Amino acid sequence: VIAYRDDGNSYYGTAIVGTVSGTNISFGSAVVFESASTSSTSTTFDSNSNKVVIAYQDAGNSNYGTAIVGTVSGTGISFGTAVVFESASAAPAATYDPTTQKINISYDDAGNSNYGTIATGAVSGTSISFDAPFVYATVASALTRAVYNDSAQAVVVAYVKTGSSNHGTSTVYKNASTNLTSENYIGIASNG
C-alpha cells in the first residue's frame, strides 16, 4: 500500500494497493482517505489485525496529527474514520511493534515546543485509539524517522535536534504491554 498526497487532486490524502508478481508491480484504483490537503504521510502494517495504518498531517484541520485504519481487499482498500492523535501540527513517523501489537507514531509536537513525542495506539476493527502522548526528547526536534528492530524488539527513532545545534540524534525505546509511562519506559540511548 502506498499512501501519498495527490497534487493533481487538491492535495488530498490518497492510497493505492500494489500487487507484486515477479519483478513487476500492478496497481488497483486510487482511493481518497482524506478529502483535504495532507502532508508528511507515513504508513505501517499491523500484522495482528491485518490492517494498514496511515498517519499524516491534516491541513484541513490545522495540520493536526491524524491516523486512519485501512482494510485491503484484493486490489482495493477501504477506510475507517480518521482519528486525531495530536491536536497540534505533527509530522509523523509510524511503526508497528509486533511484541505489544501496538502502533507507535513518533513526531515533533508543535503544540509543545516541538518536543520529540510518541503516541501509542491499538487497532480494533477499522478504528484506532491512542494512549496519552509520551515525550521522549525535551528539546525541539524535526525530520523524525522511525523503524522497528526485530532482534532488539525495540523502536529506533532518528531525528534532528533543532534545539541543540541541529545534531542528528537517535533514541531507542520499548513499549510496555500497558500504557507507556515514565515508570515503564525502557532505555533511552541517544547518539549525537
Located regions from the model:
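Extracellular receptor-binding modules and their adjoining Ser/Thr/Gly/Asp/Asn-rich linkers
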Residues: 4-6, 16-24, 39-51, 56-60, ...
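Hydrophobic, proline/glycine-rich low-complexity stretches
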Residues: 8-10, 26, 78, 111
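Polyanion-engaging groove/track-forming segments
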Residues: 11-12, 115
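A short beta-strand motif characteristic of beta-propeller blades
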Residues: 28-33, 78-84, 131-136
